[in-house]
Regions:
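Catalytic phosphate/metal-binding cores of nucleic-acid and nucleotide-processing enzymes, i.e., regions
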Residues: 1-92
Length: 92
């Protein structure tokens, strides 16, 4: 079965948010409930990302790098930050 490109995380049993899997196999998760590192979606969201092998990624100093699995998320990202993260991961 092929993975869906777009998934709501409520479908997966998580908090409010969504996941996107790009043609390069990388996945980004954007969460914005009261139980995340965000302001509940008022102005910020929590973001996590994985490469096509399932390795966790962090975006820092304008580049994606692999981090220890589940060790951190990108907290309190603005709308502009989320847009940049989505675009750069889709091109990685």
């Amino acid at each position: 079965m092929k993975n869906k490109a777009f998934t709501t995380t409520t479908e997966l049993g998580y908090h409010d948010g969504f996941q996107m899997t790009f043609e390069n196999g990388c996945t980004i998760s954007v969460q914005f409930s009261k139980h995340t590192y965000s302001d509940g979606g008022e102005t910020t969201a929590e973001v996590a990302a994985w490469d096509n092998q399932g390795n966790w990624l962090m975006f820092d100093e304008d580049k994606w790098t692999e981090i220890e699995n589940g060790s951190d998320v990108m907290a309190r990202q603005s709308v502009s930050d989320v847009a940049k993260l989505i675009y750069t991961l889709s091109q990685w």
